[in-house]
Amino acid sequence: MKFFADRHKIDYPMLGDPDSTIIKAYGVLNPEATGMQKGFARPGYFFIDARGIIREKYFDPKYRERITGNSLIAKLFPELGEEVTDTVEAPFLKLALEQSDRIGVPGSHITLVAEVQLPPDVHVYAPGAQGYKPIKLELDPVAQLELKPALYPQSHVLYFAELKERVPVFDGTFRITQDVKVNTGAEFWGSLGKDGKIFTITGKLDYQACNKTTCFKPTSVPVKWSLQVVPLDRVRAPEDIRHK
């Protein structure tokens, strides 16, 4: 563990568990692991509060697929978890493009974010609004990346007395998130080389902005993120300190 931490310049405390005592206590021992992997835990995360109580846990059903630490922080604490990669000036709103990670590995789940800031008294329509143009984040397909469905925040209902309509809307500042999963196939692993590959993720944000008196023309704004995918770290520790 020290060999790994030194190579990756990890300076926070790490827990050694040579007999898998802690792993078993948390119920995450992988009973199917054999050989050098015997005693390993199933990879995942626990969110533990200051009193030692488990508040959340995150485990993926497939061993090679997992959410990144930054992506997890982005879900638990959105104000801490993303890095702004671009700011877009668009009609009737400000758009900040963020992502949990700039670098991933095969199997990583990366979170992309479109943070929308609307002026006072301006709203956009939420998914499900009838007769209007709801806001929609739409990404273009990218080979080797699986695009998960976009997630929208909770909307609220705006009542138009003149029309006797109730319509779901967003206003103020809100975030649309979309996870991207990197391919885990062996052929893709082999194609990455030493420095990996850079993938450009493009798409658009469609919306229709309105104020108290006017609904403006539907608008589409281009969006773009960049993700570098690097090969997994396969460097082994010296033989005399390897896990037996």
Where are the regions that the model predicts?
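Short, internal strand/loop/helix patches
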Residues: 1-42
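Sec-exported extracytoplasmic/periplasmic mature domains
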Residues: 6, 27, 53, 77-81, ...
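Short, acidic, Ser/Thr-enriched surface-loop or helix-capping motifs
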Residues: 17, 48-49, 212
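Solvent-exposed coil/turn segments that connect beta secondary-structure elements
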Residues: 19-20, 51, 142, 183
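Thiol-/selenol-based redox modules, centered on thioredoxin-like
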Residues: 37-97
